Amino acid sequence: MRRNIIISLALVLMASCQEFQPVFTGDYDDPAGYEKVELQPTHTIAQLADMYVNGKPWTIDEEIIIKGVVSTTDKPGNFYKSFYIQDETGGMEIKIGKNGLYNDYKPGQTVYIKCNGLTLGMYGFKSGNYGGNGMVQLGYSDPTGEYETSYIEVPLIIDTHIIRGEIGDELVPEVITEADLPGTNATLETCPYIGKLVTLKGLKYANETFTLLYLDSNKDKKASWNRIFLSDKTLGITTWAMSESKMKEYITSGIWDSCTVGSGSDNFGKVGSLKGDGSYPTIEKAAYSVSQYFKMGNKEIQIRTSGFSKFADTEIDPEVLAGNKTIDVTGILTLYQGSVQFILLDIDGVKVNE
């Protein structure tokens, strides 16, 4: 069946521009043992997040220490150069410019962060009728100005600011209901589940996907000329994401032959014509993030998965896709432009209800 896919600008504005990247998921040598460290936190995670002012990243110039427990791992490949910590008040992403963070920051491990000199910013805020809050992050200042925070790259800065403490039991996810989900302008003060490891039960497939393609992923990922969006109920994507090989499989199948780009970008209305070698003009065959949409009651949940994750090409149960079965999911609850997003740690975070 030939398909024309017209994507409204409103849908485009819901897309994330900070995309997943490849993650090393092999094994490193065991790290050196941890010294027992106990620092006195001055602020909770929510108190630190509350110090952020929209649109104004802050390079912290106060002696602030926060304490949290690591809730994520990048070993399955669905997190890139960052991990989340949480306390009783909420969770926060810590951006560190290195792969294989699971080797140093283990789920259940206590981490103290000396915030002076680091930068507090938000990813995913948008004003206006179709906007809302994003996620407050802790990282380093971005000299390019492209994002409010960048990665902490220098090993000395990492070691003197991110202090590893005791390794304890892994966190038990909190089971939350539709009523607990964050609203458009939610903060940790109004929704302490943001950034935390949680379980959502009884999600029903919403029969919609969202896929972002780049013409050149090495160039400006915010530029309209470099971004193509596919969002429709008939794209035929039945996996959680797409690896490079799966992406090529979809392209060569011809299922997207008549896709009309409608992203409000420089490519609006243009149709990619499949070439004899099984490629589209200018579109990369690389791994990208895919969002599969589910419903929790009346609330839409966007589950984002990296094409570099180990479970990217895992098929979603056909009975789930058909709407005959629901799923329970465990992962990190986030916001992007006021919309609820969800990031799985691994495929074990998906349970099909019989």
Region locations from a protein language model:
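Positively charged n-region of N-terminal signal peptides that target proteins for export
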Residues: M1-N4, Q18-E19
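Sec-dependent N-terminal signal peptides
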Residues: I6-L9
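C-terminal motif of bacterial Sec signal peptides marking the signal peptidase cleavage site
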Residues: L13-S16
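OB-fold nucleic-acid-binding modules
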Residues: Q18-Y80, Y84-T110, K114-E354
